[in-house]
Amino acid sequence: MLEIGNLSKQFGGLSALSDVSFGIRKGEILSLIGPNGAGKTTCLNLITGFYTPSAGRVRYGDADITGRAPYAIAQVGLIRTFQKTNVLKGLTVFGNVLTARHRHGDTSVLRAFFPGKAQRQREERLRDEAAAIVEQVGLAARMNVEADSLSCGELRLLEVAIALSAGPRLLMLDEPAAGLNTQEAQQLGGVLKRLMGTSVEAMLLVEHNMALVMEVSDRIVVLNFGRKIAEGAPADVRNNSAVIEAYLGMPAT
């Protein structure tokens, strides 16, 4: 579905990512992990067009999307979240998701000021879709609650809902479990697994929460100092000596 080939990024004399290759298959959750500064978010920024690679290619299906603008990459179904929230705190949960659905719709200025029957029907459809998305992420009971009253875990779920509003084929999440307690992270994991195969075709998870990663991932890619040091199933990565050394700072015994 998505292929990363020999991807590299340099900032001046600093190599942030070096010759990294991996693929994401339809129907799987792939997690990208590594210590702080390993190059995870840099890799995500290269995939989604926020950085231009120094070398290497990014292919999505049959298309080479290397260096395309972020909006062009989003238009083909690659949607990402950011570490910094994009939630509108003054709106309700439903209002946030409905606003996001409108943002990715086809309403013109003329239609907005002179709504006809078709526009009213479209608005009703968007409202139904927004409500369905809120339910998908487990926030139906909080539908009419303002976002600034949500817990940290609920805010993260709302961020996922906003991303779903763009109609992603490949959903990419940048540290969605940051700041969550164990129960909230488990709830998030359950939502992500339910979304696979129903709302999205594949998922890329950049994450530090190892319990979440091991629970939801089909495969894991591990970066350290900008290089890929391991790739495989969760059980294999957990016992990989290079991964243990990268995280603990000492050779595995």
Regions found by a protein language model. Give the residues of each.
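Glycine-rich phosphate-binding loops of nucleotide-dependent enzymes
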Residues: 1-253
